[in-house]
Each structure stands twice: as C-alpha cells, then as structure tokens.
Amino acid sequence: TENTNARDMIISDNTVLNIFKNNGYKSYFLAEMPYLLLNKPVLGYDVCNFTNSDVGYIGTGLGTYYDILTPLNTYTKEVISQPKFFFIEIFNPGHVHGREAQSLGVDGERALWQQTLANANKTLVQTLDIIKQNDPNALVVIMADHGGFVGMEYTLQTYTKTQDRDLIYSIFSSNLSIHWPQGDIPPYDINFKSAVNVFRILVS
C-alpha cells in the first residue's frame, strides 16, 4: 500500500522541492512513465516531460517507456541564470511480479530481475554521461526506495512475516550512491546507514 496523498507530496509540495525553489532553482521532473502523475496532481516542478493530456484518467501509469535521455540532454545544456534541480525517475530494475498468477517462480523471477538490472545499469550510465558532460560539477544522488524482493515468488508475499535475513534485506534494502562534485567527498559519506533524511544532510 502507499501513503495517502503520496503522489501529491512527491510531485506537488514537499520540503526538498520547496528548499530548492526558495533558493532560486529551476526544477525538472523527468520520468520514464507517468506513474506519479496518475491522479493528475498539481505540478510543483517548473518542467515535466509529460503533459496532463499524456496521462489517462483510467490506468496504472505503467506500461510504455518514454525517453528521458533526450529531454535530459536538452535541459542540462540549456543556459539559464538559475541553478537546476532534476528529479529523474527510472523504473528498472523494479521488483518481482506482484501476484502469484503472474509469477515465474523464484528462479524465473530472479533471472528476469537480473535482466532488468542490466537495462537499468545501461540507462544509468547514459544518464550520468549526459549529466557529467553538460554539468561537470553536478552533485548526483542515485537512490532506490526499496529492494527488488528477489528470492520471493511474487511481491504480495512481502505481507507475510518472515525472519529470513536474506528476504528481509531484499525487501527493505535501499540503495544509495552519491557523485560528489570534483570528488570532494565529506567524511560523513561513509556513515550513511539509510536513505532517510539524505537531503537534510546534503543541504545542511
């Protein structure tokens, strides 16, 4: 399940976005799919690669992948007087199938997830190449909100309590990697234990 009004918090009004806007940043939301726009929230970002008409009234917001690399290249090259903040949503590697009827079994789901991981790595490399080429001093944060549930047959099994250490890590692990400008890595970088409050640390 998702938090009530989660899309509105992410897309319309949240502390991180407001900090950037209040400090003169131009903000961009680029996504491979309009999942976070499904309820047509008020757009808090200055620029988005989707319009309201791109998002249907009925659907999941998932399915067809949209190009994010072309607009990213365009907007990072754009010469403006403001600093820029980009929120880029990439959906791979995702997680195992949601329901038992869709499941390929533990081994099949693991193999499929590994394929999507390879696709994600390719997209990430292309994304980082564009950013570093057009903005060499960019601070880049790569973060996942949860694990891929690899080791399970299907996602709904996460609602069954388990003490299996590997499954717990597969469900709840969040991945975080930071590219610091000019390789200037602060000493607390290695002490990150969680992605929670990561922006509070970054902007302080």
Q: What feature does the model see in each segment?
A:
Residues T1-S204:
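Catalytic domains that recognize anionic headgroups
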